[in-house]
A protein has these predicted regions:
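Alpha-helical structural context detector biased toward long hydrophobic helices
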Residues: 1-8, 14-307
């Protein structure tokens, strides 16, 4: 990895998305996806084409190793995902090693912090701040405004041009900071409880999205990503879902709890999870079957849940 420079970088790992796909006799994987920002038809494609952005984690540096530092870190975790997947989907496996337990939690937490939506939310906040800054500066006849400790000149520039320049300059620091925050959270949550849910009913399935980690917090409606009380949920494939709970949920270290749902319980569980995926997604819903996405869209339209 260190000798080859990656340009198209997946912010949701292809190896993860493959578990929601179907392989043909040539071992080529395909998934169905729906772009909720366009609201058009459901299409099929390779997971390699989804959830990818050019130079997303590219760092500053003179060597490939320096520029690839963050991308290589994520790729190293991704190479272990098949092992993680086998652990989570083995119904007979309850007790695991400390190393495997921590690897599962590391994957979920880093996935929470590496998606494009998190960066888009930051850019939207910047855009609002720049619009206000430019407006105030114009009132005083100035050609610049201050954002934090930085002076932002805007003469003959649109807000979008300023935002693009700022993002290009600051992106490496922000990417590194997000990884740093993720690792700090992991160190505080690496002994947390793991619960796996399995759907044993062919009528119901989980799907995923371009922002697949969902957050639940029963103690407050105003929480941060780094809140230790957050429950972190991730759909693993069409039949499996993992939730990471605070440590106290399971008193025995490195034990996993497993729950099996069918019938009405499976229906309720998958509807709830899939609606959360629709709400959290920046653009794409992703599934192994077209009808799974169609059912979510139908439920949302029928119950007027788009907003």
């Amino acid at each position: 990895m260190g000798n080859q420079e990656t340009r198209g970088m997946h912010f949701v790992p292809e190896t993860y998305l493959n578990k929601f796909g179907v392989f043909d006799n040539k071992k080529v994987c395909s998934v169905f996806f729906f772009d909720k920002t366009k609201g058009d038809k459901i299409n099929a494609t390779s997971p390699s084409n989804l959830c990818k952005k050019r130079d997303m984690y590219r760092m500053e540096g003179e060597t490939v190793e320096e520029r690839q530092y963050v991308e290589d870190f994520y790729q190293n975790i991704e190479t272990k995902y098949d092992h993680i997947y086998k652990i989570l989907t083995n119904d007979n496996l309850i007790e695991i090693s400390q190393e495997d337990h921590e690897l599962v939690i590391l994957f979920v937490i880093t996935l929470l912090f590496r998606t494009q939506k998190l960066m888009s939310q930051h850019n939207n906040f910047l855009k609002e701040s720049f619009i206000k800054g430019q407006s105030v500066a114009n009132q005083y006849g100035q050609d610049h405004f201050t954002y934090g400790d930085e002076i932002i000149p805007f003469q003959d520039k649109t807000v979008n041009q300023i935002l693009k320049e700022t993002a290009k300059k600051n992106n490496p620091n922000r990417v590194a900071k997000q990884l740093e925050v993720a690792l700090k959270l992991f160190l505080n949550r690496r002994d947390n409880s793991i619960v796996i849910f399995k759907i044993e009913d062919s009528n119901f399935s989980y799907l995923t999205s371009d922002n697949p980690v969902s957050i639940y917090n029963s103690e407050t409606r105003m929480y941060s990503l780094s809140d230790f009380n957050n429950e972190l949920a991730l759909n693993i494939d069409s039949n499996h879902r993992i939730i990471i709970y605070p440590k106290s949920f399971i008193p025995f270290p490195y034990y996993m709890s497993r729950k099996i749902y069918s019938g009405e319980m499976a229906k309720s569980e998958t509807i709830s999870s899939n609606l959360e995926q629709f709400k959290n997604a920046e653009k794409f819903l992703i599934s192994h079957e077209k009808k799974v996405i169609e059912e979510v869209i139908y439920f949302i339209e029928k119950n007027n849940l788009k907003n």
